[in-house]
C-alpha cells in the first residue's frame, strides 16, 4: 500500500473541489481515506492514504488524455 495521487487512465489525476468526493473515491478503491489537495503538484487532485498496490497512481510523465 502507498499514499499517492490516484490516477485515471493515461496517467491523469482525478480533479476535485471537495474532500468528500476524494474520500469516497479513495475508499471505494481500497484506501483508508482521501482528501482533495488544493493547488498541489497536479492542481486540485485527489490524494489517497494507504491505497492498495493494484490501484493506478499518478507517476512522473505526462497525462495522456485522449
Swiss-Prot record:
Residues 2-64 form the LCN-type CS-alpha/beta domain. Transmembrane segments: none annotated. Disulfide bonds join 12-63, 16-36, 22-46, 26-48. GO terms for cellular component: extracellular region. One of its GO terms (molecular function) is toxin activity. GO terms for biological process: defense response. CDD domains: neurotoxins_LC_scorpion (cd23106). It is found in: Secreted. Expressed by the venom gland. Keywords: Disulfide bond, Ion channel impairing toxin, Neurotoxin, Secreted, Toxin, Voltage-gated sodium channel impairing toxin. Pfam families: Toxin_3 (PF00537). The keyword Secreted applies. It comes from the Eukaryota. Belongs to the long (4 C-C) scorpion toxin superfamily. Sodium channel inhibitor family. Alpha subfamily. This is Toxin Boma6c.
Amino acid at each position: 500500500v502507498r499514499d499517492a495521487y490516484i490516477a485515471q487512465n493515461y496517467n491523469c489525476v482525478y480533479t476535485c473541489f471537495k474532500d468528500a468526493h476524494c474520500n469516497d473515491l479513495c475508499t471505494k478503491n481500497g484506501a483508508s481515506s482521501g482528501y482533495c489537495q488544493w493547488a498541489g503538484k497536479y492542481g486540485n487532485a485527489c490524494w489517497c492514504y494507504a491505497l492498495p498496490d493494484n490501484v493506478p497512481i499518478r507517476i512522473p510523465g505526462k497525462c495522456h488524455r485522449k
